[in-house]
Amino acid sequence: MSQNERDSLELERKNTPPDGPRLPERRPRFSVWIYLAIFLALLVHFFLFWTGTDTSTIEYSQFLEYVEKGYVERVEIVNDTKVQGRFTEAAVREGLVSVPVRQTDLLRGAQTPELIRRFTTTKPADHDLTSFLLAYNERARAEGRPTVQFTARIEENWFGGLLTWIFPLILIVALWVFLLRRMSPSSQVLNIGKNRAILYDAMGDHRVTFKDVAGLDEAKEEVAEIVEFLKNPKKFTRLGGKLPKGVLLVGPPGTGKTLLAKAVAGEAGVPFFSISGSDFVEMFVGVGAARVRDLFRQAKEKAPCIIFIDEIDAIGRSRGRGIMMGANDERENTLNQLLVEMDGFNTDKGVIIMAATNRPDVLDPALLRPGRFDRQILIDKPDRRERLEIFKVHTRDLILGDDVDLEVLAGQTPGFAGAEIANVCNEAALLAARKGKEAVEMEDFEQAIDRVIAGLEKKNKIISPEEREIVAYHEAGHAIVGWFLRYTDPVVKVSIVPRGLAALGYAQYLPEERYLYTKEALLDRMTMAIGGRVAEELVFGRISTGAQNDLERITRMAYAMVVDYGMSERVGYVSFNLSGQYGEQAFFDKPYSEETARLIDEEVRRIINEVRERARRILEEKRDKLEALARRLLEKEVLGPRDLVEILGPRPYGDYPSPNGKDVEELKDLQKGEPTSSSAVEAPAPQTERPESSSAP
């Protein structure tokens, strides 16, 4: 036996309880409804078959014949439809009538002579049996023969009537219960107020710790205090300190807010309740508040623990919003109950409330006040160093080739969130497996980045030569205008290969990680965005629908400059912030007059016209470079930094486009006429511009 087998047996022996292995609990396979149905079936069978007696059934015509012959002694008419009678002893004894013969029954006993003489028949509705018997008795008296005694009675079938009323009721109740169970397992009447929180075992097989959360160093430092509190609460309460009752994780989608909350539970080793904000609200009134109470009740029972509410803006929006459209009373009641539960929560219990949202501006102020969610932790998109750590986490289970450089990949993916980086790694592994490779190479990662940014490459999409030429000049216009402006991002790739749902071409840039933009920087970006449309107009004398996304972007930026950032001299240093502070009411109650609105529209048009003329001047001056770049695009379809430097010359502002900083000197030497290596630098990078769309606006 090998050492591994001995270790496995020893581990199994340790995990086996002293009283032997525990068998899984078996639940009853039959529900109470099945037992009830069986009982009712037996009851019906008993009343219908066992309560009756064994009597012979004869035809009505034969019954009339027996009466005429004097074989019948007594007749009883039941409900004017059924006839029960008794033969004479002489007729039975002499065998003049047919009677049933059966063996002795243990349940009903022996067959007596009285039972043998009985018979039953069915009376037709159109026959007057009473008149027939009266006429027979008169003839029998006249002839001196025995007469037939007859009576009539009304028999009520109480059991049949009971079934007529109860059976439909039982059927309706069973159908109602069945429909409730089909709609949702938790939609039963008794469980409608139960919360839908999922309890994760922090010490289970899928435990998440801070090692699984790459980057986010500042955020992990903030939540480390929470972990320490859950491990050793007396350390804080001994000196009279209190931990914040609520921690709100704020950040863009995909940055790791939920993952960080799971890591907190994994590090502290406590139960972790996870629930979405939309799970509280139901179609029934009062269910949301009941689920909040039930959630906090369970949390108190399992303290110390963590309650994590994902997308809390679903129930935490400011009260009073949307009055013009009608307020949601159920959502507000749920929020009120949440506020009450959090305000009365005792931090000594060891229960921490965490929530995540990417819309903190719409949350109710009462939810953010001290004593509730009084600590906000920003989970922002990672920088280059943090992206490198994220790549290390997501590639540790991949078989990487020798040419894979994670530092280069981190430089090629500025603006990527953690979820997008994970998607890039997974796409690269799938591409390598599709090609039958033994390891994931750098080429696979570059193609995966292109795929995540611009979508799937459509090699077989048929485009007419005219449209292909328009797309080439459009993308060349973007690249040239951006190349010769000071505050634009370096162009690293231009392509006219169709990608995605409707993209006919795209340009990729290497954006700098900046947080402030000047007025000049915004104008340069708008000029670059409109360069494609201006190039079409300059070369072909007409425009196409491919610039729809460009026009949307520059219009949005122009309105932001005038309305939000106060960058218009005519409007002044004001900020109306329509997308943030005023929320839904901004569409109905704008904080400025009609005259100001007209002035804003005029300023937006003026700014767009200025950047358009600026782009036209640049393209007219660089017309030869525009033609050369478009011809090279039509020839190669994809151009990298080396091709751009060869055609456009040195970039007048900023560094040469290089995602990793290793090819800057090589590209500079290219402009001086010095020999360089034959390998082209075509490293893709995330675009600041969405691919051009072929759809009409």
UniProtKB/Swiss-Prot annotation:
ATP binds at residues 251-258. Its EC number is 3.4.24.-. Residues 1-29, 180-697 are cytoplasmic. Gene3D superfamilies: 1.10.8.60, 3.30.720.210, P-loop containing nucleotide triphosphate hydrolases (3.40.50.300), Peptidase M41 (1.20.58.760). Residues 51-158 are periplasmic. PROSITE patterns: AAA (PS00674). It is found in: Cell inner membrane. The chain crosses the membrane at residues 30-50, 159-179. One of its GO terms (molecular function) is ATP binding. Binds 1 zinc ion per subunit. Residues 1-23, 649-697 are annotated as: Disordered. Residues 662-672 have a biased composition (Basic and acidic residues). It is an enzyme of class 3 (hydrolase). Zn(2+) binds at residues 474, 478, 550. Its main location: membrane. GO terms for biological process: protein catabolic process; proteolysis. One of its GO terms (cellular component) is plasma membrane. The active site is at 475. Its cofactor is Zn(2+). In the central section; belongs to the AAA ATPase family. Acts as a processive, ATP-dependent zinc metallopeptidase for both cytoplasmic and membrane proteins. Plays a role in the quality control of integral membrane proteins. This is ATP-dependent zinc metalloprotease FtsH. It comes from Rhodothermus marinus (strain ATCC 43812 / DSM 4252 / R-10) (Rhodothermus obamensis). The lineage of its organism: Bacteria, Pseudomonadati, Rhodothermota, Rhodothermia, Rhodothermales.
